[in-house]
């Protein structure tokens, strides 16, 4: 039985996720799907100019996995450019450091980097905030924070 695929850490999401060749009729356009983690691998290596080890570390994967991801990404982009195909950025197996929180007092829903302090609502300043998403990437962190808060509350009683 193969090992489960590990989530790849992604820090960047493009504003535009679809690119098409100029002047080609819609009925003739075929597309290549570039996964979100493939775009992230190219961004880290080619734009941020990090070495392979640094890229793999940032994405929380092995160097070999990083190499496989970037090879796949570059091949897809090369095919799209040489054969006049559209590039659609979508899907993949990734996670992010963003977590959606909700303020219990004012109802404000906002996103933060879950590794930073999350205890104050940016709208009203309340400390009564809860995780609004319960996604896999933040479940452990939110659960750990809730346990810590419950422990501190029981200590103060």
Swiss-Prot record:
Disulfide bond positions: none
InterPro entries assigned: RNA_pol_sigma_r3/r4-like, UPF0251
Entry-linked HAMAP family: UPF0251 (MF_00674)
Family: Belongs to the UPF0251 family.
Name assigned to this protein: UPF0251 protein CLJ_B1488
Organism listed in the record: Clostridium botulinum (strain 657 / Type Ba4)
């Amino acid at each position: 039985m193969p090992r489960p695929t590990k989530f790849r850490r992604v820090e960047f999401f493009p504003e535009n996720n679809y690119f098409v060749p100029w002047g080609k009729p819609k009925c003739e356009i075929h597309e290549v799907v570039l996964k979100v983690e493939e775009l992230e691998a190219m961004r880290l290596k080619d734009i941020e100019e990090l070495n392979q080890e640094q890229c793999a570390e940032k994405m929380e994967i092995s160097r070999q996995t990083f190499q496989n991801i970037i090879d796949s990404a570059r091949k897809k982009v090369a095919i799209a450019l040489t054969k006049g195909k559209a590039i659609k950025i979508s899907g993949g197996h990734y996670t992010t450091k963003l977590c959606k929180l909700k303020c219990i007092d004012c109802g404000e829903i906002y996103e933060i980097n879950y590794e930073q302090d999350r205890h104050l609502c940016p709208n009203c300043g309340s400390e009564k905030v809860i995780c609004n998403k319960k996604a896999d990437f933040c479940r452990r962190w939110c659960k750990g924070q809730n346990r810590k808060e419950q422990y501190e509350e029981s200590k103060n009683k």
